[in-house]
């Protein structure tokens, strides 16, 4: 029996490792276009920043490691160009242009997503970069060093865009962030919470332009400037952080059913073709709160999906649960997290909500080092928590994790307000900020 996994990101490698964990005999082959594998794309901005010393430090395993430790074959710099699902066969081409075919018993599409680059004049000039692979990160640093770059425009104010903006500022560049939406982190935070992040960026010397599309990139061979809102801004390079699109071309060739957003899968991560599975950024999933199809382009979802697919291929029953798209980011000294619905998304879906708020310190007031934290908690009209956003100096991630569990368990405002939390002056307040936000919502619910 042979399982072939196309893609060496978190989803693909987790699938391969999970199959091997539960099946010691199956032949497992991972095929990837990339030269290097098992690295963390989420860490790229932090290498740019200098918080991580080198791109080599974010590579966790080599193909040789996988062969030696797990008996998994990795074919690097190899592209799958066709899938014949009727005959369980794929066609590949290696880095030298040689074509070859392989048969499979199980096929896993872990083809990820591709950066979306808007059709802007000048997008193909030298000095325009995307941020997706370790090679992208290396190319950015090399270009800065070889060209003595002083100014950069970052297009897109999502998490990657802002993390890159801060990282490039730490490298000594003047940074301009350009965002079409009227706020930073438009898919992550409500406008009032996003304003905290924007003010922090501006305090750090990063210029932020909102509700302004990038009109064109100017230069002869290299980037020289950008046009934004009819004005010319001199820059030496442009970072395009304008989102990604699921890579579903091989799924189409295989004849897999494509849903509204990406490859359609069941809870076992099977596609419409039973022996073909799909995992990671190329699949659509179910939103826990609305029950609607959505995308979940996060490493945590990719790993969970890989475990589910791997178990099922190995004969161990497993299922993937609906998502909340819990996420966290760190930009300088600011931590930003969110899970579930925002007030904006709830209003779009016409879900009646009540909002609870709290602003507090992360440690006892008298204990040195406490950081301010601000919480916005979203409840439905039945008083069940359906979303939470937190911005602050520390300990955001663990609170978002706690709220993710609370949403899944359909915890009420009353339960959250009265929940038992731990306390010690160096690490927490006696009044847990999550409970304070729930208390605020509870008062409003009681008055309805």
UniProtKB/Swiss-Prot annotation:
Enzyme class: oxidoreductase
Protein name as it appears in the record: NADH oxidase
EC number: 1.6.3.4
Record has Oxidoreductase as a keyword: yes
Residues that coordinate or bind FAD: 7-11, 42, 80, 110-113, 132, 271-281, 299-300, 423
Keyword annotations from UniProtKB, A to Z: FAD, Flavoprotein, NAD, Oxidation, Oxidoreductase, Redox-active center
This protein's record includes keyword Heme: no
Binding sites annotated in the UniProt record for NAD(+): 152-167, 179, 243, 328
Example of a GO MF term: NADH dehydrogenase (ubiquinone) activity
Organism this protein belongs to: Methanocaldococcus jannaschii (strain ATCC 43067 / DSM 2661 / JAL-1 / JCM 10045 / NBRC 100440)
Physiological role: Catalyzes the four-electron reduction of molecular oxygen to water.
Lineage, top ranks: Archaea, Methanobacteriati, Methanobacteriota, Methanomada group, Methanococci
Chain coiled-coil ranges: none
Active site positions, chain numbering: 42 (redox-active)
Family named by the database record: Belongs to the class-III pyridine nucleotide-disulfide oxidoreductase family.
Domain of life: Archaea
Any single Pfam family the record assigns to this protein: Pyr_redox_2
Cofactor: FAD
Cofactor comment text: Binds 1 FAD per subunit.
């Amino acid at each position: 029996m042979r399982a072939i996994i196309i893609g060496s990101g978190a989803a693909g490698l987790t699938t391969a490792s999970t199959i091997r964990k539960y099946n010691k005999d199956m032949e497992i082959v991972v095929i990837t276009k990339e030269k290097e594998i098992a690295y963390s794309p989420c860490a790229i901005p932090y290498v740019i920043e200098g918080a991580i010393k080198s791109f080599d430090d974010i590579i966790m395993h080599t193909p040789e490691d996988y062969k030696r430790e797990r008996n998994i074959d990795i074919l690097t710099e190899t592209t799958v160009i066709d899938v014949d699902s009727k005959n369980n066969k794929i066609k590949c081409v290696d880095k030298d242009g040689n074509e070859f075919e392989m048969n499979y018993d199980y096929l896993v599409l872990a083809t990820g997503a591709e950066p979306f680059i808007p059709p802007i004049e000048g997008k193909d000039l030298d000095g325009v970069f995307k941020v997706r692979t370790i090679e992208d990160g290396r190319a950015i640093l090399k270009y800065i060093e070889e060209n003595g770059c002083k100014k950069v425009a970052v297009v897109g104010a999502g998490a990657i865009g802002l993390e890159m903006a801060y990282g490039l500022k730490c490298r000594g560049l003047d940074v301009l962030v350009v965002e079409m939406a009227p706020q930073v982190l438009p898919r992550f935070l409500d406008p009032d919470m996003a304003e905290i992040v924007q003010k922090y960026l501006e305090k750090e010397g990063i210029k932020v332009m909102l509700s302004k599309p990038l009109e064109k990139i100017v230069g002869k061979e290299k980037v020289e400037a950008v046009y934004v809102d009819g004005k010319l801004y001199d820059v030496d390079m442009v970072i395009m952080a304008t989102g990604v699109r699921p890579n579903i071309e091989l799924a189409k060739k295989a004849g897999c059913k494509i849903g509204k957003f990406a490859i359609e899968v069941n809870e076992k991560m099977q596609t419409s073709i039973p022996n073909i599975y799909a995992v990671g950024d190329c699949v659509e999933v179910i939103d826990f709160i609305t029950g609607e199809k959505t995308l979940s382009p996060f490493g945590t979802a990719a790993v969970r999906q890989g475990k589910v697919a791997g178990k099922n291929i190995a004969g161990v029953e497993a299922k993937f649960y609906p998502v909340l798209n819990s996420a966290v980011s760190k930009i300088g000294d600011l931590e930003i997290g969110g899970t579930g619905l925002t007030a904006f998304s709830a209003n779009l879906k016409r879900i009646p909500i009540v909002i609870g708020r709290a602003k507090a310190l992360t440690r006892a007031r008298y204990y040195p080092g406490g950081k301010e934290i601000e919480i916005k908690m979203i409840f439905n009209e039945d008083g069940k928590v359906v979303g939470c956003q937190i911005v602050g100096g520390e300990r955001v991630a663990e609170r978002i994790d706690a709220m993710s569990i609370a949403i899944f368990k359909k915890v009420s405002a009353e339960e959250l307000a009265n929940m038992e939390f731990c306390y010690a002056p160096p690490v927490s307040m006696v009044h847990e900020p999550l409970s304070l936000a729930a208390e605020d919502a509870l008062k409003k619910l009681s008055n309805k």
